């Protein structure tokens, strides 16, 4: 199912978000997310089935509720595709007005948003944000799909960049048809290696692994790493700008910044600076001893290297991954949207950047 999101006027948004403007102002001021409540009566259609239905969130160590937790974007086993109105308003406020570079030609982006298993609450807003980034800046046009039927070579051929929007698990697998699974996998690898772009958001780094073991080596290497553990939202970290000269980091002005989000760690053997060009990472030296102790000893990286975003070449293609964005409020930050914009333009082949591995 493909979704066409029409532009929502600012006046309409003001009416829809009545009573939430003060909350939004506070959220932007302190870096926290607005109310996690889903609007009663807010349209959830169009929807698509989600295998297995909703999965309850994990409890943080010691039990209790996760602060600021939003439920999955699933109602009665079907995936919500409509973002919340106050989130839309906040994103529109934060969007850049111009592309990082002028596109070399009209670009088309396919945003694949079907969840496998855990359907992150941020999926509808992430898809909307990518579409609006392209529309506002003229950098690309966007098609959003929630259908696995679109995951094939013929569909991919129509697009310059494929965005994997918070996919998790073995999202291409068909247990009833191994041959179909292999066709999907081959289509993805061939698409990227032939000179196209691949962009992965947050939970897309939590795919094709079981614990610390990769399940699809070619994919695991192409992506650059896979999830092992995370600090629960709202974990505070200082984001370090590893390559201040990169045009993908221009929105950060070379300055580190503090963010609150769910912070991924990547399995020791899956991520290496010998395989990717790191753009940003957690400044582990500025994390408190108490926060460091939250991570189980068995998942800690021996090198203390907790990268957040990176780029790499895969054949003739280009890959951009950003681990931030579990919480919707991350998409309210102009500097993060600049990073996403530049990352997509890099993947499309419009923005040149040093993508040699950070370590040799």
What kind of region is each of these model predictions?
Residues 169-254:
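A glycine-rich, often tryptophan-bearing local segment used as a flexible ligand/cofactor-contacting loop or short
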Residues 70-81, 111, 121-208:
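Helical hinge/lid and interdomain linker segments adjacent to catalytic or ligand-binding clefts
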Residues 10-22:
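Bacterial N-terminal signal peptides
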